[in-house]
Structures are given as structure tokens and as C-alpha cells.
A protein has these predicted regions:
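A sensor for short, sequence-defined functional sites
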Residues: 1-196
């Protein structure tokens, strides 16, 4: 996913995101195919419910069945994305929570499986409001395990922008029930890395 998001001084955002989905994610989003733009927009608002949307629209929806590739643009405005504390704005690095439901019962009776491997790259450009300076940036983070890899880094430029680059790879595999707590900890760490 590539996105450009403008944060306003009241904490709202206007974003333009371009999604290009293959593999497991193609299957997860395939239900959008055949819906009207309004229905698909409502479905995405429901999927990405952590944003307080004022408007949301899907455009340029394409399903390339031969290559199993879905692509679409998602334009939105949302309130209360960031919090103002003094002269600082705090916000999530990744606006959309891609983590699907995971059974978080750590005591399992059966082995578990990641049936579909996938890799996902996000590049998000945040335009910071005029009058704000980027005073502090989080440390780059990287997590590696038998279940996959996760990295998140933030860089700034001279245009008062923050550029977030996030990569996640989930490995295909079957694992004994005793490793589920470790897998769950890996996925939870991925989520914790998203707040700036």
C-alpha cells in the first residue's frame, strides 16, 4: 500500500491510499469485487474501523483474475486521527490495522498453521501541518522469528514530511501447539510497533 496523508492542525486527516493485493490478501479483499463503489467504501470503513471517517471512497477498483491481483484507490477524510499535546502531534504510524482476528487463547490443544505466506509493504507519506516541526522520531524497529519478519522505520525530509516504511512477511508453516504463545507474542509485537 502506498499512501499520502495530510494531517491538519485539529488532528484530522485527508488521505489517498493505493492498494495492490496478491496472495492471501487477494482472497481477504475479494469480497469487494462486484460491490458498488458505495458498498465497497462502506465495507472498507467497517474493516478499517479504527478511523473516525467523515468521507471514504473507493475508486479505480480492478480485479485481475489471471494474476490474482486486486488494486484500488481509497480516499478518505477522518477526524481525531492525531492528538495534540502542546506543540506535538501524536499519531499511529500505520492508519489501517491489517491484523485479522487471531484466537488469543494461549493454551491450545492442537497444532496451528499459517496456510498462506504473504509479504506486505507499506509506504506512507505524512504531511505535517504548517507551524509544526518534527522534533522527535521513534527508533527503527525490526522483529525476526520463525513465523516471519517485521520492520518499521520512519524518515523525515525537508518538506516537513514523515515517511513510514513498513514491511511484514508471514511465513507458511505448521507449528506444534507449544509454540502458539510465541507466535501470538510475535503478532502482538507487530501491532505495538505502529504507534508514534
Amino acid at each position: 500500500m502506498k499512501a499520502e496523508i495530510t494531517i491538519n492542525s485539529e488532528g484530522g486527516v485527508h488521505g489517498k491510499s493505493n492498494f495492490s493485493l496478491t496472495g492471501w490478501q487477494y482472497d481477504m479483499y475479494l469480497s469487494l469485487d462486484g460491490l458498488s463503489n458505495k458498498e465497497a467504501s462502506e465495507a472498507l470503513k467497517s474493516r478499517f474501523s479504527e478511523l473516525n471517517y467523515e468521507t471514504a471512497n473507493i475508486n479505480n477498483f480492478k480485479n485481475n483474475r489471471n494474476d490474482a491481483l486486486l488494486s484500488f484507490d481509497f480516499d478518505y477524510q477522518a477526524k481525531n486521527y492525531s492528538k495534540k499535546i502542546g506543540q506535538d502531534l501524536l499519531f499511529r504510524a500505520i492508519p489501517f490495522n491489517e491484523l485479522t482476528s487471531i484466537n488469543n487463547i494461549e493454551e491450545r490443544k492442537l497444532p496451528f498453521e499459517n496456510a498462506f505466506a504473504y509479504a506486505d509493504d507499506y509506504e506512507i507519506i505524512y504531511n505535517i501541518p504548517a507551524g509544526y516541526k518534527i522534533s522527535e522520531m521513534p527508533q527503527s524497529q525490526s522483529i525476526s522469528s520463525a513465523y516471519g519478519n517485521y520492520s518499521l522505520k520512519a524518515i523525515t525530509n525537508d518538506k516537513n514530511q514523515i515517511i513510514i516504511k513498513r514491511q511484514i512477511t508471514i511465513n507458511r508453516g505448521s507449528y506444534p501447539k507449544e509454540q502458539f504463545a510465541d507466535y501470538l507474542a510475535f503478532r502482538k509485537k507487530n501491532c505495538q510497533c505502529r504507534q508514534f
